[in-house]
Amino acid sequence: MFRGATLVNLDSKGRLTVPTRYREQLIESATGQIVCTIDIHHPCLLLYPLPEWEIIEQKLSRLSSMNPVERRVQRLLLGHASECQMDGAGRLLIAPVLRQHAGLTKEVMLVGQFNKFELWDETTWYQQVKEDIDAEQSATETLSERLQDLSL
């Protein structure tokens, strides 16, 4: 399980160094193989250990290519999916097209989200956190049954 937000830097080649606390788990669970794709709702990237990504691919394969909405989701997620192999120094090369989608330059936030990571431009991340907190403080929606059972 991945959790927490960590500031990391992209080098001039577009590589990020995976924090040490995640490396062993990524090597054990995925032999360092990561799949990176775009988030279709936010300007960030999603990084999945390969076994987790394969579950997503299976779900995507069950969608109908004849349904325009389902086809669009397949196209966006699969069309942007890029395999990244963690090197011996614990670095991942993020493809230029993916960096461009998320507006990644130098300082980025690696955010653990259970079975995957989100990768955000640092400034965009803090803006999103502020928007999320503001939305929660002024929320008028009723919590779903699952959220009502969540006690923090």
Curated annotation (Swiss-Prot):
GO terms for cellular component: cytoplasm; nucleoid. It is found in: Cytoplasm, Nucleoid. Keywords: Cytoplasm, DNA-binding, Repeat, Repressor, Transcription, Transcription regulation. CDD domains: MraZ_C, MraZ_N. Residues 5-52, 81-124 form the SpoVT-AbrB domain. Disulfide bonds: none annotated. NCBIfam families: division/cell wall cluster transcriptional repressor MraZ (TIGR00242). Belongs to the MraZ family. This is Transcriptional regulator MraZ. It comes from Salmonella typhi. The gene is mraZ.
